[in-house]
UniProtKB/Swiss-Prot annotation:
Gene3D superfamilies: Immunoglobulins (2.60.40.10)
Protein's name according to its UniProt entry: Immunoglobulin heavy variable 3-9
Region Complementarity-determining-2, annotated ranges: 70-77
Lineage: Eukaryota, Metazoa, Chordata, Craniata, Vertebrata
Region (Framework-3): 78-115
A cellular component term, taken from the record's GO annotations: immunoglobulin complex
InterPro entries: Ig-like_dom, Ig-like_dom_sf, Ig-like_fold, Ig_V-set, IgHV
Encoding gene (name): IGHV3-9
Complementarity-determining-3, as annotated region: 116-118
Amino acid sequence: MELGLSWIFLLAILKGVQCEVQLVESGGGLVQPGRSLRLSCAASGFTFDDYAMHWVRQAPGKGLEWVSGISWNSGSIGYADSVKGRFTISRDNAKNSLYLQMNSLRAEDTALYYCAKD
């Protein structure tokens, strides 16, 4: 009986680790106004192409602001008015990755950028 409980406990731990959602952003930096940056987000722990994905940001001292979103198959894409025409969201389902190409950067784009799943 004691051995059986140990195995159940071990399986529960392994299942929890396997299902842990991880979203790891990269590509940020310090650039002059007018320049470009490309952000990447590597996803794991879930079936990436089952979900719409989003970029949100938080400027210093402010709340979260939605920046852009993309459907699972890239068929539907949306942007906040503040970035429309300058930012481009894309995804590569084969690589479980989300991207944000940011052009013509402005001082007001200074923020922490996060990717998020639906």
